[in-house]
Design a protein with these regions (language model features):
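Pepsin/retropepsin-fold aspartyl endopeptidases
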Residues: 1-386
């Protein structure tokens, strides 16, 4: 009798993987055409537990080196993706080992660490830190980044000791590009120490920062952003949340956190998932698809046009309009400048973005452990959008 192949059920295009102690949230894209779609483990000795998680199901294997293990991911109950775990030690691993975050405090009874940040005139969150024992560098905290980044000019000027050891596909707001990557780096920011940090090297010409600290630096943590005190507090578990906060669900799309927001024109509400992006110096942005579907192109007053460049280096044009009303959780904002893509970049499915010109108006508790964010208006709520 043939051995029954295990099956993982999902309704989505991506699933999560836990390899040993490393958890990769919504990282594995299901590929029914691959036959098989192969996941190669990192080298190990003895045995290792590999688990796959969908939104409603899970499947675990105890694996040994130099073996292959087959299973099926059944998408929407009808489309099978034949998948294989490959533990051969000389194969190139599919995923890099996850970074490790530790507190340098010797007595941390509070189970939290507090970092002081500076809010730039561009609305970005700046932290002072080091990479691989470098001199002090300017980091920005970017929840819209699924990996940390070093600016290419720092490496070229030999201001940081970062060894580039491969290539990786990078998806930015302007499209997809191949960039150099580095593994096994060390970050130090305040009382926090990260080891085994993967980095991308991106040519951020003209951008006022040295490093990008992606949200994955705090995976499985709770991050509290207080713009009244300029404190970024890292908790191991959710602190007490007062009733003034509005709770929103987080949905991870291609490894980036999104929240639902509403635009309101002439009493008509349009809702979509927006990239929760503290690394954006803008207000809100929507794609041409969203604009066309919700009749925004010829309805709103155009107040300007611009040409932008994202992390892939490609230029794209936008028009700026005044959105009469925007709803974020239980809170409403009025006459919000918003950009609309003239044409959506290729290779990027989700174009809606809420940047830190808006997000800075809310103190936030971001629960990366349970996929939720809590927002409360702060002293910046009524500040100008300019």
């Amino acid at each position: 009798m043939a051995k029954k192949i295990p099956v993982l059920h999902t309704e989505n295009t991506h699933i999560s993987i836990k390899e040993g102690d490393s958890f990769y949230r919504n990282t594995w894209r299901i590929s029914p055409d691959a036959k098989p779609d192969v996941f190669v483990t990192n080298p190990f000795v003895g045995t290792k537990k590999i688990s796959f998680y969908s939104e409603s199901d899970s499947l675990s294997f105890i694996v040994k080196p130099n073996k292959k293990y087959d299973f099926i991911v059944l998408q929407k109950g009808k489309e099978p993706a034949y998948t294989q775990i490959d533990t051969y030690q000389k194969e190139k691993p599919t995923l890099m080992p996850k970074l490790i975050l530790k507190s340098k405090k010797t007595d941390n009874k509070s189970q939290s660490d507090t970092l002081r940040f500076t809010l730039g005139k561009n609305s970005l969150i700046y932290l002072k830190g080091k990479v691989n024992n470098s001199d002090s560098l300017d980091f920005i905290f970017d929840t819209g980044a699924g990996i940390s980044v070093v600016t290419q000019s720092l490496i070229e000027a030999k201001k940081v000791n970062v060894k580039l050891d491969g290539d990786q596909k990078n998806t930015g707001t302007d499209g997809v590009s191949m960039v150099k990557k580095s593994s096994g780096n060390v970050f130090e920011i305040g009382s926090l120490l990260w080891t085994n940090v993967p980095l991308l090297s991106i040519d951020y010409k003209g951008f006022p920062f040295d490093m990008v600290l992606g949200w994955v630096a705090f995976e499985d943590k709770v991050v509290e952003l207080n713009y009244d005190t300029n404190h970024l507090i890292i908790h191991n578990s959710l602190p007490a949340v007062d009733k003034e906060y509005s709770k929103l669900d987080i949905k991870f799309i291609n490894g980036i956190p999104y929240i639902k927001c509403k635009t309101i024109v002439n009493g008509i509400e349009s809702e979509a998932w927006f990239d929760f992006d503290t690394g954006s110096d803008g207000t809100m942005a929507v794609g041409q698809k969203f604009a066309a579907q919700n009749a925004l192109n010829n309805t709103l007053k155009v107040i300007g046009k611009s040409t932008s460049k994202g992390s892939s280096g490609k230029e794209f044009t936008q028009k700026y309009v005044l959105m009469p009303k925007v709803k974020v959780g239980d809170f409403e904002l009025y006459q919000v400048p918003m950009s609309i893509n003239d044409q959506d970049p290729e290779g990027v499915e989700n174009h809606e973005n809420i940047g830190n010109v808006i997000l800075k108006r809310f103190n936030a508790i971001i629960d990366f452990k349970n996929n939720a964010v809590y927002l409360k208006p702060n002293k910046l709520f009524y500040s100008s959008f300019q």
